[in-house]
Amino acid sequence: MLFIQDELYKEYVKMMMNIVILCMILSISLSFWMISITASTYSGTLRPISPWRWLVSLLTPIIIVSHGIKKRSLDSSGALGGLLVGFILTIANYSFFSALLAFFFISSKLTKWRGEVKKCYDSEYKEGGQRNWVQVFCNGGLPAELALLYMIENGPGEIPIDFSKEYTASWMCLSLLGALSCSAGDTWASEIGPVLSKSAPRLITTWEKVPVGTNGGVTPIGLISSLLGGISVGVAYFVTQLVFVDDLEIAAPQWPIVIYGGMAGLLGSLIDSYLGAIMQYSGYDESTGKIVNHPTKDAKFICGKPILDNNAVNLFSSILIALLLPTAAWSFWPRL
C-alpha cells in the first residue's frame, strides 16, 4: 500500500511540474506578445487592437465561464484557467474562439449525458464534468500557446487559411484547429462510444475484448463519434471564417477546414487510445465492478503502465496532431 501511495505521489509531482512549466511558457509567450504588439503598433506595421475587440475578448469568456460554473462543467480552478485560455483565443482570432466554444459546450453536454450509465463503469466520474485547471490547460494550453504565436506572427484578427500567401499563420491556424479537434474527438469517443456500443470494446494494441471504460479500448461507434467531434469543431471554425473574413473571394477555398477537423478528431482519438493502452494503467476493481486508473489491492490488471494520467495522454495526443495536421494539409490544400 505504501508503494502505491509513493508511486501516486511521484506521478502527481511529475504532473504538477508539467503544468507549472506550461504556465511559465504561456506567461513568457504572453509577455513577448505584449512587447511585440506594442512595438509593431508604434512602428506602424500593425493596427492597434480595437476597443470593441478588447471588450468582446474580456466579456465573452466571463459569460461562458460563469455559465460553466453554474452548470457544474467547471470548478473554481477550471474557471480561472478557462478565463485565461478563452481571452487569449478570442483576442487572437474569432475563429479560434468559436472552435473552442464548440468543443467546450458540446463536450460538456456529452459528459452529462447518460451520467447514470457512466457511473457504473467509471470510478472517476464527476457529476456535470467539473473540469479543473489541469484539464483546462491540458486541453486548452496548447491552443493558447499557438494563439499567442499566431498573434506575434500576424497580429490579432481573422485571416483565410492560404499556404501560398500566409504560410506561417496558416500553419498555426491549422495546428490550433488540429489540437482542439483532437480533444473533441477523444471526448466524443469516450462519452458516446461506451454508452451506445452494443459490443465490448477491443484493446487497440492487441484487439482483445476488454471491459467498458478501459484505456485504449475502441469501438466502431466510438471512432465514428470521434470523427463527428472533429467535424463539429471544423464546422464552427469554417462558419466563423465565412462571417468575419473579408477577402475570401481571392483566397484559397476554406471548406477543407471541416474535412481536416474530422481527420484530426479521428486520428487524435486513435493516438490517444494507443497511448492510453500502453502508458495508462487500467485495472478492473472486483470490489466495485469499475475500471480504475491506479493499481489497488482489489484491481485485476488489464493493460498499461502507470506512467501518464488521462490529462497527460490528452496533451501528448494534441501535440502530435498539432504537428501532423498542418504538415499534411500543406501538401493537399487547394491553391488558386
Curated annotation (Swiss-Prot):
The keyword Transmembrane applies. It is a multi-pass membrane protein. InterPro entries: DUF92_TMEM19. The chain crosses the membrane at residues 19-39, 49-69, 86-106, 218-238, 250-270, 313-333. Keywords: Membrane, Transmembrane, Transmembrane helix. GO terms for cellular component: membrane. It is found in: Membrane. The keyword Transmembrane applies. Belongs to the TMEM19 family. This is Transmembrane protein 19. The gene is tmem19.
